[in-house]
Amino acid sequence: MLSSLAPYMANPRQTLTQVLNFALVLSTAFMLWKGLSVITNSTSPIVVVLSGSMEPAFQRGDLLFLWNRSPRVDVGEIVVYNVRGKDIPIVHRVMRSFPELPGREDKKNVKKGGEEGEETSSTPSQKLLTKGDNNMADDTELYAQGQEYLDRKEDIVGSVRGYVPTVGYVTILLSEHPWLRSVLLGFMGLMVVLQRE
């Protein structure tokens, strides 16, 4: 097996160039993702619909484009949120909005300089109740234990601004079958390294 790699090891400069080209492709993709995150103000500017809870609006496997620059979310808007303590994005529609009363302050326990204290924020945060279009009940059962609504600033990843149907099935297949991901990455890496210019 090692004898088949001998022609590639004979010219280490070409092999190094190919490895660096592969690293350049990966770093460019990473920079594009981070740039898109900054532009949209979202940690995940592109997500895939993982369930059928939003049918008929979105099907499982649809690729969604998010925007998180709006200070408020309107009732009827479709948002993506993360449940506290879990890293699974959920795509559902806002059913109700509970704005904070003017002049009321949010209080959080914050450690400052090693001491625990209370920090007040004069910027009110919008509270939201969501529901999947294809679900019978609202999402209070999906929220973290003791959570009755979503916090606009803490829980919302972004609002849906566009989508491409069924393209996300590749992501679903790769997450449901980890061996397929390894095979695909190995194949791509092998093709880059073995490619001759």
From Swiss-Prot:
It catalyses: Cleavage of hydrophobic, N-terminal signal or leader sequences from secreted and periplasmic proteins. It is a single-pass type II membrane protein. It is found in: Endoplasmic reticulum membrane. GO terms for cellular component: signal peptidase complex. The keyword Nucleotide-binding does not apply. Component of the signal peptidase complex (SPC) composed of a catalytic subunit SEC11 and three accessory subunits SPC1, SPC2 and SPC3. The complex induces a local thinning of the ER membrane which is used to measure the length of the signal peptide (SP) h-region of protein substrates. This ensures the selectivity of the complex towards h-regions shorter than 18-20 amino acids. SPC associates with the translocon complex. The C-terminal short (CTS) helix is essential for catalytic activity. It may be accommodated as a transmembrane helix in the thinned membrane environment of the complex, similarly to the signal peptide in the complex substrates. NCBIfam families: sigpep_I_arch. This is Signal peptidase complex catalytic subunit SEC11. It comes from Paracoccidioides brasiliensis (strain Pb18). The gene is SEC11.
